[in-house]
Curated annotation (Swiss-Prot):
One of its GO terms (cellular component) is extracellular region. Expressed in hemocytes and secreted into the plasma following bacterial immune challenge. This is Acanthoscurrin-2. It comes from Acanthoscurria gomesiana (Tarantula spider). Keywords: Amidation, Antibiotic, Antimicrobial, Fungicide, Immunity, Innate immunity, Secreted. It is found in: Secreted. It comes from the Eukaryota.
Length: 131
């Protein structure tokens, strides 16, 4: 599998971080999430613990929590909730939803789901996934 995301580095950006598989979101981020797009990894983070994209174990924020914690405007659960996950487009996998993951730009779940551009690549500019 080839993940194409943000900047360099295996976890800090690119493969898993910065819009990568485990990061996703408008601002991206690795396993811990963070940034404007909210963390989709295990830690969440960003604007109000999840930010626009929500996600992570804690979830919360504008896009709703997509992780195990849920919360926020759209609610959560394992796959659903938020503007994208279960709302506009439906979330897939553990991360799901957010403004892009399954919503505006599509998204294929995993632990992070898509970002604004959707897909495993996530991130603001999208990203490409090849199986």
């Amino acid at each position: 599998d080839v993940y194409k995301g943000g900047g360099g580095g295996r976890y800090g950006g690119g493969r898993y971080g910065g819009g990568g598989g485990y990061g996703g979101g408008l601002g991206g981020g690795g396993l811990g999430g963070g940034g404007l797009g909210g963390g989709k990894g295990l830690g969440g983070g960003g604007l109000g613990g999840g930010g626009l994209g929500g996600g992570g174990l804690g979830g919360g924020g504008l896009g709703g929590g997509k992780g195990l914690g849920g919360g926020g405007l759209g609610g959560g659960g394992l796959g659903g909730g938020g503007l994208g996950g279960g709302g506009l487009g439906g979330g897939k996998g553990l991360g799901g939803g957010g403004l892009g993951g399954g919503g505006l730009g599509g998204g294929r779940g995993g632990y992070g789901g898509g970002g604004y551009g959707g897909g495993y690549g996530g991130g603001y500019g999208g990203g490409k996934y090849k199986g």
